From Swiss-Prot, chain B:
Protein name per Swiss-Prot or TrEMBL: Acyl carrier protein
GO biological process terms on file: lipid A biosynthetic process
Residues modified to O-(pantetheine 4'-phosphoryl)serine: S37
The encoding gene: acpP
Family: Belongs to the acyl carrier protein (ACP) family.
Subcellular localization(s) per the UniProt record: Cytoplasm
Recorded coiled-coil stretches: none
Keyword Lipid metabolism among UniProt keywords: yes
Record's GO cellular component terms: cytosol; membrane
Pathway: Lipid metabolism; fatty acid biosynthesis
Gene Ontology MF, one: acyl binding
NCBIfam families (alphabetical): acyl_carrier, PRK00982.1-2, PRK00982.1-3, PRK00982.1-4, PRK00982.1-5
TM spans (from-to): none
Boundaries of every Carrier domain copy: 2-77
């Protein structure tokens, strides 16, 4: 597994900072946000690799960097960590053909499209880089990863806004179940912390603007003072493998994907339906496909974006768990890293697997005064040591798309 | 070496990320310097920009080596 996020570079580095209750949110540094309503975001820290920061040239050769938008850079960083961690470097043609890639993005190369638009607008269309299109295309993370490692199996990509990461991992696991591949590198990558991305979500009144002077307090899921989400950038990638295949080669197995459920709201382009009934149905479908009892689930990594929709998701989870709600821990790790859009679901699925590995529920930062009381423990401020055998992770996207994934220890 | 040759060499080194010593006049962008077809399109654009010349597509297709590029640009500049 591999992660690059506002908490830094690397799986264990991210996890230990998350569990320690640290935040990756700050004032936007990659450009001057003064003209915009929102000034905060989660950006990947730049610095030496040893310090858990990103030095891009350690991962992507300088001459290749300009051929890819930043979301591809970040996807390659996390994919490299994940593939190295998995130890799966197939040499034979047959093994390569049985290894595929499914890495998505919610938005893709937004900054690249912005820059190219200006070139054309200025009457310099003939000066447009021949790398513009392949730099911006969402499926090019999958493409670059396949080229780097020689993975010749299914090469696919998912685009379902903020549900992308969960859909990519879920769909990739289904491809393995259907026999299309033995190994799939799956996840999401996003780099939309740019003027156009921030301005667009500002116009949709989706971003937090009340905490510009206290960035670390801006992402506060379920808190009564929350006023919108905080955008983050990064990537989360996992290597999925058919169980017997992994066992036969003695691979390190972090966990098992046991359930996956999807639904559509058919309601509104950005707002969830009453009681988040679409989320309820996605979770229900995931539980059904896992063949488990709801009470087996000890931890839920919520979509919990720090918007009004948080309480609707809470209602849906309460409805699903019924009398078992009191035994459940549910947190939103977006409180620490912001909302990574198309990468969110992948990073959060990884956090869910690590929660099982270490029997720790990561905290929900800034949950000072819940706007709604609940029997569910939302792990305010500090991580909790508790037994977690099975975890569920939710991701919901604009367009009314919902996805839930259930993971279990092995 | 002429000023044009120097500048061409510098652009090639920068765009293809190759060592300066490999950028000899005879070096082919694709066969010797690791460029692909998109790299060569970008290189020609960089030459156009740097030398304020127009390199039409049919001429660009004939620029395969470092020397081809230098010769073409020198001829344009002399004209």
């Amino acid at each position: 597994m591999g992660i690059v996020s506002p908490l830094g570079l690397g799986l264990e580095h991210n996890w230990s900072r998350l569990i320690a209750g640290e935040s990756g949110i700050g004032r936007i540094a990659s450009f001057d946000p003064s003209d915009l309503a929102a000034h905060v975001a989660g950006e990947v820290p730049v610095g030496p690799t040893e310090a858990g920061c990103l030095t891009l040239s350690d991962w992507v050769p300088v001459k290749d960097q300009k051929k890819m938008d930043r979301f591809i850079h970040l996807g390659l960083v996390a994919a490299t960590e994940a593939v190295e961690d998995s130890g799966w470097k197939p040499e034979s043609e047959e093994d390569r053909c049985r290894t595929g890639v499914m890495i998505g993005s919610g938005i893709g190369g937004l900054q690249t499209i912005y820059d190219a638009s200006i070139t054309v607008h200025e009457g310099r269309a003939r000066r447009l880089s021949p790398f513009f299109i392949p730099s911006a295309l969402i499926n090019l993370v999958s493409g670059h990863v396949s080229i780097k490692y020689g993975f010749k199996g299914p090469n696919h990509s998912v685009v379902t806004a903020c549900a992308t990461g969960v859909h990519a991992i879920g769909d990739a696991s289904r491809l393995i179940m259907l026999g299309d591949a033995d190994v799939m590198v799956a996840g999401g990558a996003e780099a939309a912390v740019c003027p156009l991305g921030i301005a667009g979500f500002c116009s949709a009144r989706a971003l937090s603007t009340a905490f510009n002077d206290a960035p670390e307090k801006a992402s506060r899921p379920w808190d009564r003072d929350r006023d919108g989400f905080v955008m983050g950038e990064g990537a989360g990638i996992v290597v999925l493998e058919e169980y017997e295949h992994a066992k036969a080669r003695g691979a390190r197995i972090y966990g098992e994907i046991v359930g996956y459920g999807m639904s559509g709201d058919a309601y509104h382009i950005t707002a969830p339906a009453e009681g988040h009934e679409g989320a309820y149905r996605a979770m229900q479908a995931a539980v059904r496909s896992a063949g488990i009892a709801v009470s087996d689930i000890g931890y839920v990594n919520a979509h919990g974006t720090s918007t009004m929709a948080d309480d609707l998701e809470l209602q849906a989870v309460e409805r699903l768990f019924g009398d078992d709600a009191g035994k459940l821990a549910m947190s939103s790790t977006k409180s620490a890293i912001g909302h990574l859009l198309g990468a969110a679901g992948a990073v959060e699925a990884i956090f869910s697997i690590l929660a099982i590995r270490d029997n720790v529920a990561p905290p929900t930062l800034n949950l000072d005064n819940p706007s709604t009381e609940s029997a569910i423990d939302r792990v305010a401020h500090e991580a909790q040591r508790r037994r977690i055998d099975v975890a569920l992770s939710n991701s919901f996207g604009f367009g009314g798309t919902n996805a839930s994934i259930i993971v279990r220890g092995v | 070496m002429s000023e044009i040759a120097d500048k061409v060499k510098k652009i090639v080194v920068e765009h293809l990320g190759v060592e300066e010593s490999k950028v000899t006049p005879e070096a082919s962008f694709i066969d010797d310097l690791g460029a692909d077809s998109l790299d060569t399109v970008e290189l020609v654009m960089a030459f156009e920009e740097a030398f304020s010349v127009e390199i039409p597509e049919d001429a660009a297709e004939k620029i395969a080596t470092v020397k081809d590029a230098i010769d073409y640009i020198e001829k344009q500049k002399a004209a």
